[in-house]
Amino acid sequence: ASDVYKRQGQVCAVTGLTRAKPGTGLGAERDSDLPVLEPVLSYRVCLPEGADVHAALGKLHRLEEEEPQLHVVWNETLGEIHVQLMGEIQLEVLKSLLAERYGLDVEFDSGGILYKETITEAIEGVGHYEPLRHYAEVHLKLEPLPRGSGMQFAANCREEELDKNWQRLVLTHLEEKQHLGVLIGAPLTDMKITLIAGRAHLKHTEGGDFRQATYRAVRQGLMMANQIKKTQLLEPWYSFRLEVPAENIGRAMSDVQRMEGSFDPPETAPDGQT
């Protein structure tokens, strides 16, 4: 058998992939950047009576792999499936796909806005975990970042204070989950979390101890920021271009302002459109 080469833009088939999705890099190729658009609404999936919720969850996850702008969330506490997407059109497409591919007739409840949380001032959080025969302590610096930066993690800790292996473990625990804020429990964003200090015990420290200490340090830092009014709730917003006839520009501007929007000065095109 000989190797087969494809040029950029050509379509080919690859076997043996188990966790591939749009944007995944193969071999030396890096994964593509995150989608520019992120879901802004969340809906609860209402399954038919008697339907297997876990089987439905698996089917939704398969569709999620095909569509990067669809996020499927399993709420273990409530035993509910939630989908996060852009709006009603995508919702109708999802409903149609589930019916056509899997014969699954689902409904969705009224959607809710996907808020996020951040901080407005740098603060330090400390997490201490010391039950019997366990020990770990983590000091984190939480800093705000410009809008659209997402979450960033780093370490600035001396090895004399905390061994490099433990430092890497703390970073792993920071990156492995979606951290939630303390205002409404929304996901954190636009924040840098840096490991600045930590302690371990030669005899009693185990890997799971640093997971607990790390999560507690994040939480404690957020609680401290909230006490001094340095936490902030973020809501999604849209940037778009609106083209209307010149005689309708006043009404359009009034409607945008009425919905708490803002706009740049209007521009008139040669055909009279504004």
Region spans (language model):
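Accessory interaction regions appended to the cores of large information-processing enzymes
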Residues: 2-274
